[in-house]
Amino acid sequence: MQYLLSKKRIRKNFGKINLVSSIPNLIEVQKNSYNKEFLQLGVPVDCRENKGLQGVLNSIFPIHDLDGSAILEFVRYDFDEPKYDVEECIQRGLSYTAALKITLSLIVLDDSDKSDPKEIKGIKEQAVYFGDIPLMTANGTFVINGTERVVVSQMHRSPGVFFDHDDGKTHSTGKLIYSARVIPYRGSWLDFEFDAKDLLYFRIDRKRKLYVTTLLMALGMSSHDILNFYYESATYKKYKKSENGWIVDFLPELVSTKHLAYDLIDAQTGKVLLNAGQKITFRIAKMLADKGVKQILVKNDSLVGKLLAEDLVNNQTGEVLLGVGEEITNDILTIVNDLQITTVKVLAVGGQCGPYVRNTLFLDKNKDQKSSLVEIFRVLKPGEMATTAASRGLLDSLLFDNNRYDLSEVGRIKINSRLNLDIDLKNTCITVEDIKKIIKLLVDIKDGKALVDDIDHLGNRRVRSVGELVENQFRTGLVRIAKFIVERIGSVEIDAVVPNDLVNAKLLTSVIKEFFGTSQLSQFMDQTNALSQITHIRRLSALGPGGLNRDRAALEVRDVHPTHYGRICPIETPEGQNIGLINSLAIFAKINRYGFIESPYRRVINRRVTDEVVYLSALEEGRYKIAQADTSLCTNDCLIDGLVSCRYDGNFVMVLAQEVDFIDLTPMQVVSVAASMIPFLENDDANRALMGANMQRQAVPLLKSQAPLVGTGIESVVAHDSGTVVAALHDGIVEQVDSTRIVVKTSVKKDAGAPGVDIYNLKKFQRSNYNTCINQKVLVNVGDIVKKGDVIADGVATNKGEIALGRNVLVAFIAWNGYTFEDSILVSERIVKEDIYTSIHIEELELVARDTRLGPEEITRDIPNVNDESLRHLDEVGIVNIGAKVRTGDILVGKVTPKSESPVTPEEKLLRAIFGEKASEVKDSSLYVPPGITGTVIDVRVFSRRGIDKDERTLAIEKQKIRKLVKDYEDELAVIQHFTIVRVKELLVGQVAACSLDSIIIGDKLDEAMLNKLTNEQLLKLKADNSSIMDEISEIKCHYETTRAQLTSQLNSKIEKIQCGDDLPQGALRVVKVFIAIKHRLQPGDKMAGRHGNKGVVSKVVPEEDMPFLEDGTVVDIVLNPLGLPARMNVGQILETHLGWAGVNLGRKIGKMVDDYYSGNNQCTDEIRKFVKKIYANNSIADTIDQVNDQQLIEICQELRQGIYFSTPVFDGAKIADIKQMLELADVDKSGQVRLIDGRTGEYFDRRCTVGYQYLLKLHHLVDEKIHARSIGPYSLVTQQPLGGKSHFGGQRFGEMECWALEAYGAAYTLQELLTTKSDSVEGRIKMYQAIIRGNNNFVSGVPESLNVMIKELRSLCLNIQLEENDEEDENEDENY
């Protein structure tokens, strides 16, 4: 139990549904895609599959030159070790990469050999450097130029065939225009579409449309083939008993709704089925066919208008009377009767079989393959010479060439599935059979026999993860390299070159750098807190290259779709124009090898719910009946109800229990990580839940983190998977602990049985991407036993291994003097005084000393025209000291820059002669603390170019780093040495000495006391007469020496890396980075929020004595507006408040019992045990309570007295009755309301108020970072007006309405000053400055620039306005008149 308390927090779980499968690692989406699927790291070369990087290289190589004299083949690829680790890359501003070495084999062929294949003259194999490839960190991110970035997964339309219609928008009558589109993974798009006249067309790459029959004939089909493929035939046979009658097959699908013109007679029985004038429909015809009607009798004239299925030939002369597909007319019918033709085959057209293909065929001017190919060529390449061979080659290259057209396995699966084909998955080109079947299905859809696709169905959308995105970039780069190699082979003497001479790696690295640096999907990682990191990694974007455009994305794409269930979160998405386009993966969802999102379900076999978990994609799910997770089950996991509500094919249906195929794993699987952290989510309005999920990601990590009293149970999972906490890599025992590192002796045995040593260096006060503070705190003590995966150190915004974004504070829902108006938040002074919502932010400031054309810039303390007060924080080198408290305007790093010579006056010459020349030659270009920053310098990093002399500060920093490395080296060696000595002693005890050493003589029997007197060196030299023991000792000594040599080598290489200097950008000599920690206390203007979308701004910090307080004297921490609840419908916050209130009061009750125990009442332990078991009833912890002794129980209760922590999972959490039960156990009112006393008057409020503990967050919208004040500052070069915005240190806009306000009060001089001197009167500014210097209070405004602009505009309208200046006397004379 102590182990449990020290590593994990005990939570009372209200969940009813047992989880049979754990939550999959939350960042495996990224890691699997890049490391396993793309790079195949850790896979032996011989075992690599043909995918990812291996697949791309196999598809590009071998490369043949144009004349067949050489072949360049791919053999294998390998990666070098990264030059720097992740931390070093972040510190130095480098990318975390590894060199890609590809082994290529150049096969030189004999040109003179005319045989095929040619004789090989020689083979040259070489490993060629192909550039540096970014590696993924353990947290699923990339380090590019020193900053962590995330490559977001992209949702896009899956390759395959899609059938759609235009919703009647194209045609004025609202007629549906059907179309089909074949989308390959790579290559040309192929479209098929109907027009308003029901003719069928095709397009390639959205070029001009052509008749679809042109394509079919170009693919080798004749008119006869086309008609026979797309239409069934019906045979009319002459009825022998009547000259005017025919027998024909009865086909219901050819029947159209109409009134019969003649009797419908069964040909076999002669029975009249329907009389003339009766109505016939497809349904009636189907019923007749089902009853056994096979053939019917029709009159002679029924053949008129039918279309021939084969040529109508005069049997006597062989003459073709009517061609295939042509219409039978009365004249033709007369000829048929005259020639006594007894059998006529016609196309089965009519009713539900439209003549679209036939009509298109007869309007198509192209009648053979040659003309069809030429027609297609002219459309695709207008203006070029069209030949049959060129036309055939173009069509083949566009649609049937593997190098240019690729459906991918996904596309082939989709096409096979949609068209019911069985083509091999390796055939990733479109086939003629595909095209024929697509047209046939499109015609069927037009005829109403099939349905169009739902493009928003997740079976039609897939995810391109980071590995696939980078693979596509690799393909682009390697195609460029392949072209370069072909050109290069043709321009060199092939016998004299090696593969390295043929490759230009920059063509690949430039593409990769561009993608990681500037792509819309490669994003600056959101590092505000652990949740924001994990959410960013799990984000799905429909935007980006090959995706949607946010300006044109329709509502349907953004909307929630039934197939999102368990795959994409319906709640978490941004507010604003990206809503619905950027989504988050559901918490249990996985992405399969084809890029489709899968959700987990438990299999149900004959009503019994098994523990087998099956992941289903959206397409697979539609075929099964899936019950809800909260469906009633009996004790042996069988369905109780006879009828069960299930999801089937996108709808909710009631099915028999024995027909159920699957059941949801957990109700939580619907939502994302952030949404699943909102307790009582089911009681919140979806819009507010969206805000709550989004605002948790904006929570600033606090100085003192606290896990939520009311959680959902996944807080520890999020903290662990985000990588912000430190988890033990192996089982072991903690050897050493300090604030910066943990040393663990692992139980994993290495060679000779020696233990391993894990050293965990903690991150201390590092800056994140968003300037928040990354700091890790130790949780373990020396001697603690740790298991693999245990949290041994808390990270940013975590507490005891659980994510902790805010604080549990006592809130009251009351109105308080209007200070809670419009969601404002009233805060007690205690919150500020005790640093409850204080956060540390770290600013990074950088100074670069460059080599200029006038000479090098110098970092120095000797700065011209700067007094000693300004230099007080600098050391002798000119760099600020760590620990200095700095404010705006202070110098952080002194730097002087050489300036060009200007003409020197005699006075300056004299001054130079007296004071020396240095001051005149340089100007101050130091690094100053920018406006709005006041804090403490916590770190300084100095980087110097290789080869230049290092200053004292640089050397001191290097010594500190080396000292830390040596300490790690000594500690790791000490653990191994200790094991070695102990093990050697164990082996030698009881043995006979075989050599004399110190006080030991040959033949002495060795005991522990004798061995303890020897030094470590002597002990390792001692020999015994037992050879097997000596062999084992030799093995241990050998392992020790080998390990020491390895550690020494590693230490030396690390020290060399530190001392060798840095790779700096061109022209930079030194770079100094200064990190300033800024403490932000809570103050009016800061934004705060709960987890339910309840947000507000701090309006006032009120003294504790004025705040409302409880009857026991407890002062309320925060006052919230009760009116913020009804309209927002986020009732979850009230339930959370009540449950938090119960938790704290239960803790207080346990605390009183513990105090009673310590005061001497030792008999109360049974009562405590009984009470604690009552709280944790129906939880596994209740059984543990029975197993601990009294002392351990009291230790547990000491932890619990701070408050009982609850877990209320999403959709399966605490009900009202559960909350009331907890309130009752805590001996507080079941209503959750108390009587509050007004701190100002000491009187009770009129009625009872809702008071309780709510988890509130401080968001990353701090007033200190929003508001600034300008006195003087920069002006725009064009308008000469002050700039705007904090980043430009701009002013506040004084607009038209503000001018009206001053005009209304007659403040003429104030208005004049604002519109001239303080705005754009350059002359007025200078005069004011001069007047202030002279101590004169009379200011002259001058003419503003905006007036000159207006005059120029009026002149453009031919109105010449001139400003005239009159003397004062003239003005007086004018007044006298």
Curated annotation (Swiss-Prot):
Please cite one Gene Ontology biological process associated with this protein: DNA-templated transcription
Point out the gene that encodes the protein. rpoB
- For this UniProt entry, what's an example GO CC term? DNA-directed RNA polymerase complex
- Give the reaction(s) catalysed: RNA(n) + a ribonucleoside 5'-triphosphate = RNA(n+1) + diphosphate
Q: How does this chain assemble?
A: The RNAP catalytic core consists of 2 alpha, 1 beta, 1 beta' and 1 omega subunit. When a sigma factor is associated with the core the holoenzyme is formed, which can initiate transcription.
> What family does the entry list?
Belongs to the RNA polymerase beta chain family.
Q: Can the keyword Nucleotidyltransferase be found in this entry's annotation?
A: yes
GO molecular function annotation: DNA binding; DNA-directed RNA polymerase activity; ribonucleoside binding
| Organism (species) | Orientia tsutsugamushi (strain Boryong) (Rickettsia tsutsugamushi)
Q: What function is annotated for this protein?
A: DNA-dependent RNA polymerase catalyzes the transcription of DNA into RNA using the four ribonucleoside triphosphates as substrates.
Annotated EC: 2.7.7.6
- Return the broad EC class: transferase
User: What highest taxon heads this organism's lineage?
Assistant: Bacteria
Recite the UniProt keywords alphabetically.
Answer: DNA-directed RNA polymerase, Nucleotidyltransferase, Transcription, Transferase
UniProt-listed NCBIfam families: PRK00405.1, rpoB
Entry protein name:
DNA-directed RNA polymerase subunit beta
Q: Which residues form a coiled coil?
A: none
